[in-house]
Every structure is written in C-alpha cells, then in structure tokens.
C-alpha cells in the first residue's frame, strides 16, 4: 500500500480488499484461538500515538486478545497470477464476520507477515469494526499500523453520498480541511 514503505499491499486495506478470483479458496474449518478483540484501550480518546507505537510492535499495554471461534480460510494464489503473497490464511471471527488475523506467505512458501485487526463494537451503529490494523514483517522485524481513530473525528457510518461528492473539484476541496 502507499505510504507504508512496502510493508502493506493495496489489497491489505481493511485486511483484504483484493480480487477474490486471483486465489483458490478453501475453508479449512473452525477453531478457537486468541485473537485481537474489544480493543477499547487502544481506541481510548487522548492516548498519544507515541505511547501506542513502539519499536517492533504495538504497545501490549493497549492490546486485548480474547478466545474466539474463527473460521480458517486458506487462499492460495492461482497459477499465472502475480502477487507478493503466494498464500494467505484468514482467521474470520464467527460472531462479527470480520477478518481478525491473516498469516501471509512469500513466493517460496515461507511465513512472512502477520496482520491483526484490533476492533471494537460501535454500539450506536451497530457494527464491530477495526480501530487499528497492524501488519508485522516477521523477516525484517518491521511493522506498520494504520487506521488509528482515537484522536480523530468519529467515523460517519451510513453517510449518504452522491456522484457530485466525487468530482475532482469536490475532492480537491475535501482534501484542504
């Protein structure tokens, strides 16, 4: 993805936003495992980003993991398709249907990266949605984290848009806030 120094791909947005037809998909089953969940401390207003972002990993004092049932879905890159990940294993929360973690493998089949989606319940919407997504490169020891919302304006879920909201002039004005 842009602005991630190569640590994240565009199709990693919201954990996975790629073309599903590029992979062979297989439901491996369902299991219980510890996954990021109810990350209210990470989402708390006023917590400085410098307190959360630490060398090598997010500050564990702000993270929460819970035992949840997840569906394990394996996506193997189809022959002739190009992507830096030859395989991804998705862990999809049984309750929210959110992808809460992904194991990603390089072209040699080696375990390369781990993605975690730290979410919370937005009870007034209602929806369970990420507050921070992190991608850890296990080979380089680097990581990137995006989507911090605790010191930003609240997401406007369900906002109505029209085609005129996406004209070059309107987008230019929106970018100057």
Which role does the model predict for each range below?
Residues 1-69, 80, 161-177:
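Flexible, processing/modification-adjacent segments and terminal tails
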């Amino acid at each position: 993805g842009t602005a991630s120094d190569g640590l994240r791909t565009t199709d990693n947005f919201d954990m996975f936003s790629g073309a599903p037809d590029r992979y062979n998909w297989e439901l491996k089953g369902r299991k219980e495992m510890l996954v990021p969940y109810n990350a209210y401390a990470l989402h708390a207003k006023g917590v400085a980003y410098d307190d959360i972002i630490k060398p090598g990993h997010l500050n564990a004092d702000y993270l929460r993991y819970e035992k949840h049932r997840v569906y394990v879905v394996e996506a193997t890159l189809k022959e002739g398709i190009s992507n830096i990940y030859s395989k991804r294993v998705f862990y999809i929360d049984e309750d929210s249907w959110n992808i809460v973690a992904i194991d990603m493998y390089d072209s040699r089949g080696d375990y390369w990266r781990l993605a975690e989606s730290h979410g919370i319940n937005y009870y007034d919407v209602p929806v369970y949605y990420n507050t921070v997504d992190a991608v850890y490169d296990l080979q380089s020891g680097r990581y990137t984290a995006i989507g911090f919302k605790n010191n930003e304006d609240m997401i406007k879920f369900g906002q109505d848009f029209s085609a005129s909201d996406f004209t070059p002039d309107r987008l230019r004005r929106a970018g100057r806030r």
